[in-house]
Amino acid sequence: QQWPPGHHIPP
């Protein structure tokens, strides 16, 4: 999955 810069990735 793609996350924006500085985004917190959930577990």
Curated annotation (Swiss-Prot):
It is found in: Secreted. GO terms for molecular function: peptidase inhibitor activity; toxin activity. Its main location: secreted. Expressed by the venom gland. One of its GO terms (cellular component) is extracellular region. The modification Pyrrolidone carboxylic acid is found at residue 1. Keywords: Hypotensive agent, Metalloenzyme inhibitor, Metalloprotease inhibitor, Protease inhibitor, Pyrrolidone carboxylic acid, Secreted, Toxin. Signal peptide: none annotated. This peptide both inhibits the activity of the angiotensin-converting enzyme (ACE) and enhances the action of bradykinin by inhibiting the peptidases that inactivate it. It acts as an indirect hypotensive agent. This is Bradykinin-potentiating peptide 11a.
